[in-house]
Design a protein with these regions (language model features):
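Arg/Gly-rich low-complexity intrinsically disordered repeat tracts
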Residues: 249-295
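Conserved NTP-donor binding/palm subdomain of two-metal-ion nucleotidyltransferases/polymerases, i.e.
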Residues: 1-123, 129-251, 292-411
Length: 411
């Protein structure tokens, strides 16, 4: 019951639910605000939920001390967003100036879809660069020269810090453990990159413009991203809210893309009759895009997880079925939602898995590698029933990846 009230309040905070029971205080009698605050921190939704609190009558709002803490954290989130918007545009322009096409993945590009972008807790700058691994290594060295450092190189990106901002330069936006699905995923990425690097959006606070993924690409890619994190560590409601906006933006993005294509073909709709015809054809266009997206999800092995995520979006954020890109899968969805509630942001708060987390001593020496790998196997076994292809492939991929890292370090 408590979670149901939380879900409704999140919808109220996002502006998608009227919330009369919150405005008149009837749902908040004896409400445990401290517990809700802890929930908001665990799920990295402090700024989002503050949007709802700011609309409440004073009589039903949190006590002054808690309210001030909440407000100060929200203001800090807002300041970080302002800084990161400017930093994102700065890094994007530097990469473009170096001669590479690129686009911003997730992050501030996702924030731009929010009603109040400043309420979303920001992360780092993820950039997909259309270049070879060797070129991206050189690019990372160039960016790190300005008050920065190279942090690490992984299979799909190089992480660096420049002017205090964490940046990931991606060779590819991601990978899958199943080799067949991974091959298809990489092919899909290669076929998609040009369109993503041409799709310009304006970041909030008049920070400037950057390239960001199209709506139809995001519907598949960000679902893959959630699936990947679900297997390797976990996902939280912050990531779910991001994907909620991706789905809401899907239909609008499809129509905008269609109109841009028609403009490029000099097919401007000048007469009222033309506009009427365009309106009639909008629904089939959206349906065709959904079918194309569903085909991609099936081909990439994401169909079952898509159904689970649609269930979570419906239960937590009230997503209507007509907006969904796949039918709800209740069994997988209930398991996913339970893991989200237990684990919080990227699974970092899941006490069920505390035994497997990496630990470090004062010198930064890792003691938890064994526990980390056992935890991976434990997660694979838990998910085997519902996602067998990835669960069975993950241990094999991990061995291959260990060899890949060893080989990279020899270079």
């Amino acid at each position: 019951m408590t979670e149901k009230i939380y879900y409704k309040f999140i919808q109220f905070a996002l502006g998608t639910y009227e919330g009369k029971e919150f405005l008149d205080g009837s749902a908040l009698n004896g409400f445990d605000w401290q517990r809700f605050y802890d929930f908001a921190k665990k799920q990295t939704l402090v700024g989002i939920i503050m949007e709802g609190i700011s609309r409440l009558p004073k009589a039903v709002a949190p006590k002054q001390s808690l309210l001030m803490n909440w407000f100060m954290m929200s203001q800090n989130i807002s300041r970080k967003n302002l800084m990161l918007n400017e930093a994102t545009v700065g890094v994007y322009n530097r990469v473009k100036a170096a001669g590479y096409d690129c686009c911003i993945l997730k992050g501030q590009a996702n924030a731009a879809m929010y009603a109040n972008p400043a309420a979303r807790t920001p992360g780092d700058v993820d950039m997909w660069v259309d270049a070879s691994r060797k070129e991206i290594r050189q690019l990372a060295q160039t960016l790190a020269k300005e008050n920065g450092r190279i942090d690490e190189e992984s299979y799909n990106h190089i992480a660096l810090t420049t002017n205090g901002i964490s940046v990931e330069l991606h060779y590819t936006p991601g990978f899958m453990a199943n080799f067949t699905y991974n091959r298809r995923l990489q092919q899909w990425f290669r076929e998609s990159i040009d369109a993503q690097c041409r799709n310009m959006i304006a970041l909030p606070d008049e920070a400037g413009e950057v390239a960001a993924p199209t709506a139809d690409f995001n519907a598949v890619y960000q679902l893959y991203h959630l699936y990947h994190h679900y297997f390797y560590e976990g996902v939280g409601l912050r990531q779910v809210v991001d994907y909620y906006y991706v789905i809401l933006n899907f239909e609008l993005g499809v129509l905008n893309c269609r109109l841009r294509d028609e403009e490029l073909k000099n097919c401007e709709l000048e007469s009222q009759n033309s506009k009427l015809n365009n309106s009639k054809s909008a629904k089939p266009t959206i349906q065709n895009s959904k079918l194309k997206t569903q085909n991609s999800l099936t081909r990439l092995g994401l169909w079952h997880f898509a159904g689970a995520m649609m269930y979570v979006l419906h239960e937590v954020l009230g997503l209507p079925e007509e907006k969904m890109i796949a039918p709800m899968d209740k069994k997988r969805g209930e398991m996913l939602l339970n893991d989200i509630l237990c684990g919080g942001n990227f699974g970092h708060h899941d006490e069920r898995h505390a035994w497997g987390r990496d630990t470090y001593d004062g010198n930064g020496f890792k003691h938890g590698a064994l526990g980390h790998n056992l935890l991976r196997l434990h997660r694979d076994l838990r998910l085997l029933r519902y996602y067998p292809s990835e669960a069975l492939s993950e241990p094999i991929f991990r061995l291959w990846h260990y060899y890949w890292r060893w080989k990279i370090h020899q270079l």
